[in-house]
């Protein structure tokens, strides 16, 4: 009984020999080559050729990406620091693009009791002026358009050819700005409204209008009609040339964009608009 206890050692653990893992690993490699997926075969070939596993290559890729990210962040920090230390002219250049900044007076506080020591230590932040693409509109476009319209109207009234030192004349008054009712194209900037028919206008200077001189429109005055009716009772001969001259002759005027008839053109070179959309001048 004592002999059995001496031979038995509970802490003795049989360890596998060094040859068994080699056999198992070689069998695994053979199994991968015969029945493995393309990814497994690729990993196995890489390990055999380079001696590096897939995890080591992934670690190198992560290191490269981290180094690239650090260099990018450093470049951005240098650009921001150059903006902060730039001149107070309100203009900076980043990446070849000139940026503008608001004047500091727009953001100054009105209170004079503010602690000056704090303001000196605190770095003043420059407020960048957004570009037109960022605002999705041009704030100065309306002013440029209005200046163009005023210059056109001054030119109509012979105010455009002035000396530079001469005082600029005020823009002449216009009853409305006329537009095509079909395509909204501007037809006239300077016009006069009819005294009786409020939807009719006359003008001498137009744009985007074409005159159809091949078509003639005749209009007989009411006074001539009365005279002609009384003359028919006295005679039956056709109209004489004098009565034809009393008729008013017009030519139709169309919009050049959509060919909508918008006005008529008389012999005195005056346009009479009757089919238009009028807006405030």
Curated annotation (Swiss-Prot):
Phosphothreonine sites (modified residues): 37
Cell compartments where the protein resides: Cytoplasm; Nucleus
GO BP, sorted A to Z: negative regulation of transcription elongation by RNA polymerase II; positive regulation of cell population proliferation; positive regulation of transcription elongation by RNA polymerase II
InterPro entries: E2F-assoc_phosphoprotein
Basic residues composition-biased segments: 225-235
Keyword DNA damage: no
Ranges in a coiled coil: none
Disordered: annotated segments: 1-27, 222-245
Positions of post-translational Phosphoserine modification: 17, 109, 111
Domain of life: Eukaryota
Positions with biased composition (Acidic residues): 15-27
Subcellular location, principal: cytoplasm
Keywords: Acetylation, Cytoplasm, Nucleus, Phosphoprotein
Stored Pfam families: Eapp_C (PF10238)
Residue positions where N-acetylmethionine is found in the record: 1
Any one annotated GO CC term: cytoplasm
Subunit structure: Interacts with E2F1. The C-terminal half binds the N-terminal of E2F1. Also interacts with E2F2 and E2F3, but not E2F4.
Functional summary from the UniProt entry: May play an important role in the fine-tuning of both major E2F1 activities, the regulation of the cell-cycle and the induction of apoptosis. Promotes S-phase entry, and inhibits p14(ARP) expression.
PANTHER family: E2F-ASSOCIATED PHOSPHOPROTEIN
Name this polypeptide is given: E2F-associated phosphoprotein
Lineage summary: Eukaryota, Metazoa, Chordata, Craniata, Vertebrata
